[in-house]
Amino acid sequence: MIFAANFKMNHTRASTKAYLDALNQKLASKRSEDRVFVFPPSTALDHYDGDFTIGAQNAYLEKNGAFTGEIGLDQLDEFAIKTILIGHSERRDILGEDQAFVAEKFSYFKSQGFEIIYCIGEALEVREAGEEAVMVHLLSQFEGIDLSYEKMIVAYEPIWAIGTGHSATTEAIASTHAALKQHFDRPLLYGGSVKPANIKEITAIESVDGVLVGSASLEVESFTQMIFA
């Protein structure tokens, strides 16, 4: 099972270090087959010791250059970061990354050998239009994406469930994941208001290979409760 914590724009460099020190101690008894990822803000990227993988929430598709406010391959290489989130709905919807740019970013980091957690998801109005509309929308988010890339993990996050406290039903998760898995053979995570109270029922779904957790991962106790549930 895969457990990924996306801190988004939360935690400082100091609090991230304290979090990861505590996490490392708690992971001493984790199941060997489980994988743990943590995506801190870019200001907290560093070398950390532990049975977890540190990834970047975002980076620009260049080694370096005149891209104000961005980080590139040089900054990631400094800390041996080889894992990245791409396609998160907040980057698409708030920061204006269209599918063409997302696909370009995917291709660049694929060419650099990165492990990529690639995010897809639908808005509430799409979900309300029915399962067929949902699948048409989700599959459109794979345009330009190499589904055979061996270092890709897919994360399905219904936008209407992110940060709202309202997760999709287990039936909806199972149905959507099963439909998606007809199109690729990569690990598939669920994200969207995942928390200790619902982690067992979500990870019990056959087509769920793990979870991408936002707000419920910000406290190390909460995140480790999910890992050891």
UniProtKB/Swiss-Prot annotation:
Q: What is its EC number?
A: 5.3.1.1
Gene Ontology MF terms:
triose-phosphate isomerase activity
Please cite one Gene Ontology biological process associated with this protein.
glyceraldehyde-3-phosphate biosynthetic process
**Which key words tag this protein in UniProt?**
Cytoplasm, Gluconeogenesis, Glycolysis, Isomerase
* Pathway membership: Carbohydrate biosynthesis; gluconeogenesis; Carbohydrate degradation; glycolysis; D-glyceraldehyde 3-phosphate from glycerone phosphate: step 1/1
Q: Which residues form the signal peptide?
A: none
> Record-annotated residues binding substrate?
6-8, 163, 193
Tell me, in one coarse class, where this protein mainly resides: cytoplasm
Query: Is the 4Fe-4S keyword given for this protein?
Result: no
Q: Which reaction does it catalyse?
A: D-glyceraldehyde 3-phosphate = dihydroxyacetone phosphate
Q: Give compartment(s).
A: Cytoplasm
Family membership: Belongs to the triosephosphate isomerase family.
Q: Quote the NCBIfam families the UniProt record gives.
A: PRK00042.3-2, tim
Share what the entry says about its subunit structure, partners included: Homodimer.
Stated name of the protein: Triosephosphate isomerase
Tell me the organism: Sulfurovum sp. (strain NBC37-1)
Query: Which gene specifies this protein's sequence?
Result: tpiA
